A protein has these predicted regions:
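N-terminal secretory signal peptides that target proteins for export/translocation
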Residues: 1-9
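Kelch-like beta-propeller repeat domains
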Residues: 29, 33-506
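Bacterial N-terminal signal peptides
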Residues: 14-25
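Enrichment for repetitive, rod-forming helical segments
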Residues: 9, 15-16, 43-46
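Serine/threonine-biased, Pro/acidic-interspersed low-complexity stretches characteristic
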Residues: 5, 14, 29-32
Length: 506
C-alpha cells in the first residue's frame, strides 16, 4: 500500500489502484439479461430454500464461476463497524460489554491474518456511530449511544467523537459535535472536510440540522437552517453519495431522494423511488460516478418483508428518474453491497424476515453492464443485521459480524470471499507506479502486461456499518497503452476523488 501526502486540495487520494487485464474479465452476453421487474418477482425464492439448494451435492462449486470462501475465523469482536486503513489493516469495533464503558476494538492485518487489541482507552459507547476516513488516513468516528437505564425508553445519542491513527495504532478523543447523534451519516467533501448529518439526539429525536468538521482546525460548525434535512426524508444512516459536481445525493432510505449543495446549503428534490420507502437497503454510486444503484431493503421501517427489487438513477440525465433493473434472486435487507475490483457489485449477507430471521447465506454478483445477477458460493456463517463487508487490497472481500443473539460465536467470526475474477488467470504485474499523484496529472505505470490491460481504476477503501458504506468509491481512469507501460490520467478534481491516502491493488 502507498500513502499519499495530503493537506492541499490538489493532492490525491484515499483509493486502491486497480489494473484489470483481459484474462481476468468475462461478461455474460446481452441475451443472458434478466427481464426488468417492478416487483420482487415471483421467482425470487426464500432464503431458506435457496440456502438449502446451494448446500446440496449438486450445487455449483467452480471458483471461476461462483467464487470461494475461507473457513470462518474468530476475530474476538463482533464487527458491527469496520474501516479499511491505508496500512492494509481493518479497524473493527462494537459496543461495550457488561459494566465496561470502553468500546472493544481490534486491528486485523489483511496480509498476515494477525490481530491486535486496540480497545478505545477512554469511556464512550461508539456503537451505531458514523465514521469516515480523513484525508490524512485517520478514521473519524462520530456519535454513538448514551444508553438509557429505563426500560421502554428510547436510547439517546452522544456528542462525543474519536479519532484512530493508523500510524501509531492509537485512539484519541476528538472535538465533540454541536449535537448528539446516534446512527449518523458521515461523508467526506471535496474540501477534505466531513459533512455529518442525521442521527438521534439526546432526546432520541432525529437531528435535522447538519454540521461540518474541519480536520485542519478540529472545529465543528453547525450549518444554517436552510441545510436542515428535509422533514419528509428524516431517517438514520442516510445513504449519501458525493457527485462529480460537488453536490451530495441522498439515496434513501425514504422514497423521496434529494440532492444537497454544500455551496448554497440547500436541498433539492431530485426524484422518487418506484419501490417507495426502501428502509435498510444498500446503495452505491456506480463506477461512472453519474448513476446511483440501490437494492434490497423493506417498506417496513421496523424490518421484515424484504424486497428483491433494485433501482438505478442517472443523475447526469436532464430529468433524473429512478428505474427498476433486474431484481435479485433472493429478497434481503440489512445486507452489504460491495464494489468489487472489476466494477461489479457483490450483495452479501442480510435477512428476509425480522432483523435476524431467515438469514441469506448466498451472495449475489451484479453486473451493471449486463443487468444480471449471479448467485455465488454459499458462506458458512450468517450475516444479517449488524454485519459488515469490505473490498480488500488483494481483490478479496471481508465479510464479518452480526450480533444475532442466537449465534454469538458466529458473530465474532470473519470470512474471506474470493470473487470469480481471481480464478480466471494471472494478475498483471506492476513494475513501478508513482507514490503520489495530483488531480488531472498524467502518470506512468510500468508493467510487462500493458497490452492486456483493459481498465485502470481508483477504488476508495470502505468504511461501513448497518448496510451503509460511507466511503467506497470506484473511479475509472483514462488510460493509453504503450510498450511495457501505461499512461494514465488522474481524476480531474476532488469532486471525483476526495483527497487522502491510497493503496495499490492488482
Amino acid at each position: 500500500m502507498r500513502t499519499i501526502v495530503s493537506g492541499k486540495r490538489s493532492l490525491l487520494i484515499p483509493f486502491l489502484i486497480i489494473i484489470i487485464a483481459l484474462t481476468v474479465l468475462t461478461a455474460l452476453p446481452l441475451s443472458a439479461r434478466q427481464s426488468k421487474s417492478a416487483k420482487p418477482a415471483a421467482s425470487a425464492q426464500t432464503a431458506s430454500a435457496r440456502n438449502a439448494q446451494a448446500a446440496s451435492p449438486g450445487a455449483k462449486s467452480d471458483p471461476s464461476q461462483v467464487g470461494s470462501w475461507t473457513a470462518p475465523v474468530n476475530l474476538g469482536v463482533i464487527t458491527i463497524h469496520a474501516a479499511l486503513l491505508h496500512t492494509g489493516k481493518i479497524l473493527a469495533w462494537w459496543y461495550p460489554q457488561g459494566t465496561n464503558v470502553n468500546s472493544p476494538a481490534k486491528l486485523y492485518d489483511t496480509v498476515t491474518g494477525k490481530t491486535k487489541d486496540v480497545t478505545v482507552p477512554f469511556p464512550g459507547d461508539f456503537f451505531c456511530s458514523g465514521h469516515t476516513i480523513l484525508a490524512d488516513g485517520r478514521v473519524l468516528v462520530t456519535g454513538g449511544l448514551l444508553g438509557n437505564p429505563h426500560p421502554g425508553v428510547p436510547d439517546d445519542g452522544i456528542t462525543a467523537t474519536a479519532i484512530f491513527d493508523p500510524g501509531s495504532e492509537t485512539w484519541s478523543q476528538g472535538t465533540p459535535m454541536n449535537l448528539a447523534r446516534w446512527y449518523p451519516t458521515d461523508v467526506e467533501l471535496p474540501s477534505g472536510q466531513t459533512l455529518t448529518l442525521t442521527g438521534k439526539n439526546e432526546h432520541a429525536v432525529i437531528d435535522l440540522p447538519m454540521e461540518q468538521y474541519d480536520p485542519a482546525t478540529e472545529v465543528w460548525t453547525l450549518l444554517p437552517s436552510s441545510a436542515n434535512i428535509p422533514q419528509q426524508s428524516s431517517d438514520t444512516y442516510l445513504k449519501m453519495k458525493l457527485l462529480t459536481n460537488g453536490k451530495v445525493f441522498m439515496a434513501g432510505s425514504n422514497a423521496d431522494t434529494y440532492t444537497f449543495d454544500p455551496a448554497t446549503n440547500r436541498w433539492t428534490l431530485t426524484a422518487t423511488m418506484n419501490f417507495g420507502n426502501r428502509y435498510h437497503g444498500a446503495a452505491v454510486i456506480l463506477p461512472g460516478l453519474t448513476k446511483v444503484f440501490t437494492a434490497g431493503g423493506t417498506a417496513n421501517h421496523a424490518g421484515g418483508g424484504a424486497t428483491a427489487t433494485a433501482e438505478v438513477i442517472d443523475l447526469a440525465a436532464p430529468a433524473p428518474q429512478w428505474s427498476f433493473v433486474s431484481p435479485m434472486h433472493i429478497p434481503r435487507y440489512n445486507s452489504n453491497l460491495v464494489i468489487l475490483a472489476d466494477g461489479t457489485l457483490l450483495e452479501v449477507g442480510g435477512a428476509q424476515t425480522e432483523r435476524y430471521g431467515t438469514p441469506v447465506l448466498i451472495p449475489e454478483l451484479y453486473d451493471p453492464s449486463t443487468d444480471t445477477w449471479t448467485e455465488m458460493m454459499t458462506q458458512t456463517d450468517s450475516r444479517p443485521y449488524h454485519s459488515t463487508a469490505l473490498l480488500l487490497p488483494d481483490g478479496t472481500v471481508w465479510s464479518a459480524g452480526s450480533d444475532d443473539p442466537t449465534k454469538k460465536i458466529a458473530g465474532h467470526s470473519y470470512e474471506i470471499f474470493s470473487p470469480p475474477y481471481l480464478s480466471k488467470g494471472a494478475r498483471p504485474t506492476i513494475t513501478s507506479a508513482p507514490s503520489a499523484i495530483t488531480y488531472n496529472q498524467k502518470f506512468t505505470v510500468t508493467t510487462p502486461d500493458a497490452a492486456s490491460v483493459t481498465k485502470v481504476a481508483l477504488v476508495r477503501p470502505g468504511s461501513t456499518t448497518h448496510d451503509n458504506d460511507f466511503d467506497q468509491r470506484y473511479v475509472v481512469l483514462d488510460v493509453r497503452h504503450g510498450t511495457g507501460k501505461l499512461s494514465v490520467t488522474a481524476p480531474p478534481s476532488a469532486n471525483y476523488a476526495p483527497p487522502g491516502c491510497t493503496c495499490s491493488c492488482w
